[in-house]
Regions:
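Conserved donor NDP-sugar-binding/catalytic core segment of glycosyltransferases
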Residues: 35-62
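Glycine-rich, basic loop-to-helix element that forms the pyrophosphate-binding segment
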Residues: 1-16
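Short aromatic/hydrophobic "clamp" motif used to bind/position activated sugar donors
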Residues: 21
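The conserved acidic donor/metal-binding loop of glycosyltransferases
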Residues: 25-29, 51
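Conserved nucleotide-sugar donor-binding catalytic segment
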Residues: 14, 75-146
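Catalytic core of nucleotide-sugar-dependent glycosyltransferases
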Residues: 72-80, 135-139, 144-178
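Acceptor/aglycone-binding surface of glycosyltransferases and processive sugar-polymer synthases
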Residues: 55-84
């Protein structure tokens, strides 16, 4: 079976037992205050998305703000329909978000886009400007280089349709479970 970041993260989340989940990429470096800062916000919100400093492989700063580089919006409609604002390694969320997001729909573009939209449409999300990781980019990096999407306009539109469709299906599923 072909593996992808989405399938790998889905498998990991199925096994996650804690009340709080922090996503991480293997080559990013957490700052010492990441957990404490996110935990403070997770007392009021179900999902926290922090900013990051974008670095090269030697941790030299390339861009001081991931949010500015990617033009991150805090508006859930904008994030669902136009431009993704959710970067997995910058996310921490509660068990309820995890439980709602699983299992992942088969046609979602990427795990963090799905989790971020589930959190935004069903729970409370907080974007924080604190730069809590060094987001390392190098020649082997597959995702997020600030140079625009590698996908065609058609493919990006189909990703958005998939996210919106699956969020609507999830909302109907949850409402169906709570009305019976």
């Amino acid at each position: 079976q072909k593996h992808s970041p989405t399938l790998n993260f889905e498998n990991v989340l199925h096994h996650a037992q804690g009340d709080y989940i922090f996503l991480s990429d293997q080559d990013d470096v957490w700052k010492t205050n990441k957990v404490a800062t996110c935990m403070k916000w997770l007392q009021k919100y179900d999902c926290v998305i922090s900013n990051a400093e974008v670095t090269d492989e030697h941790l030299n700063i390339l861009f001081p703000s991931l949010f500015k580089l990617l033009h991150v919006s805090k508006n859930k409609i904008y994030n669902a329909l136009w431009k993704n604002g959710y970067t997995g390694c910058c996310m921490a969320f509660t068990r309820c978000v995890k439980d709602a997001a699983l299992p992942f729909p088969k046609d979602i573009p990427m795990y963090d886009i799905w989790i971020g939209n589930v959190a935004a449409f069903l729970y409370k999300v907080k974007f924080i400007d604190d730069k809590l990781i060094y987001f390392r980019r190098h020649s082997l990096t597959i995702s997020c280089n600030g140079k625009g999407s590698r996908y065609s306009l058609y493919k990006r539109l189909m990703f958005r349709v998939s996210i919106v469709k699956n969020i609507i299906l999830l909302i109907h599923k949850i409402k169906g479970l709570t009305t019976h």
